[in-house]
Regions:
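Solvent-exposed, low-complexity segments and loops of surface/extracellular structural proteins
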Residues: 131-144
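Residue-level detector of intrinsically disordered, flexible termini
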Residues: 143-147, 151
Length: 272
């Protein structure tokens, strides 16, 4: 019966592989999405006194589902509040309701009625405060990106631009342009330890380490590409090959179960 359970584990592993590949394919067009792959490990029956030449295999198990944070294609949109990261950094967003900070590669932002620069879910983009020249005031502290809807002269906000160096510049109806802040990018010692929470967002864990916040093009964060978005890093051709392989593995394990069942039936028939 060992072969039956070994093949049953193989079926479950193939299902996990198929589900992961299907998830990748479904998100091939999701902005900032990062693909995943399943890592398997073999199982053996052994003990301290076991003869290594007699060690019996017990199949395989899922060792982990690994995220691939390789860069996706950067696509120009021409929109002033779209920005892509050409490097390893993450945008940080804060939920104003519970102060939860999440990290994303999706740089599609908009400004709401209060002047807050947010993502599609209403989370506030994090930035560094700057002085009138664009220099960082307090490099170690991030704040919500809040844009004054009127300047000191009472002129209304007319446009907003995120530049390649992360500087957020506001232009007002009187023709003046003022720096508001600089986008803060987060980096991690082990980004594969980030926990995905959906909508191309991740949260920090003990496996990823705490975030390090830096200005764009500093350390490992990478440069910004204004007027562009990072597409998913899913390669559909590669996923289709993996899908076929996973399907064949599933079929092979199902056949092994069928064979084990026939063996068992033969033994039962011998006893009757």
């Amino acid at each position: 019966m060992t072969s039956f359970y070994t093949s049953l584990n193989g079926l479950k592993n193939s299902q996990t592989d198929l589900s992961t590949i299907a998830h990748n394919i479904a998100n091939a067009e999701t902005t900032g999405f990062k693909k995943s792959s399943v890592e398997f490990a073999d199982l053996v029956a052994n003990g301290s006194a076991a003869n290594p030449r007699m060690t019996q295999g017990l199949g395989a198990t899922v060792a982990g589902i690994n995220q691939n944070f390789g860069l996706g294609a950067i696509e120009q949109t021409g929109r002033s509040l779209d920005v892509a990261i050409d490097g390893d950094g993450f945008f940080a967003t804060r939920n104003p309701e519970n102060n939860e900070v999440l990290f994303t590669r999706n740089g599609n932002f908009q400004i709401d009625a209060t002047g807050a620069l947010t993502n599609f879910a209403g989370k506030n983009l994090q930035m560094f405060e700057t002085d009138a020249t664009g220099a960082l005031v307090n490099p170690g502290v991030t704040v919500d990106a809040i844009i004054p809807v009127t300047n000191a002269g009472g002129a209304d906000l007319s446009s907003l631009v995120i530049q390649n160096d992360g500087l957020i510049s506001a232009t007002y109806s009187d023709g003046t342009t003022e720096p508001v802040g600089r986008v803060a990018l987060a980096s991690f010692a082990a980004p594969t330890g980030l926990r995905p929470v959906g909508s191309s967002n991740w949260e920090a864990t003990g496996f990823s380490g705490n975030p390090t916040f830096e200005a764009p093009d500093t350390g490992r964060t990478g440069q910004l590409r204004s007027g562009a978005l990072e597409k998913s890093n899913v390669d559909l051709a590669e996923e289709m090959v993996g899908l076929i392989t996973a399907q064949r593995n599933f079929q092979a394990n199902a056949k092994a179960i069928d064979t084990a069942t026939q063996f068992s039936q033969t033994v039962i028939n011998l006893r009757t």
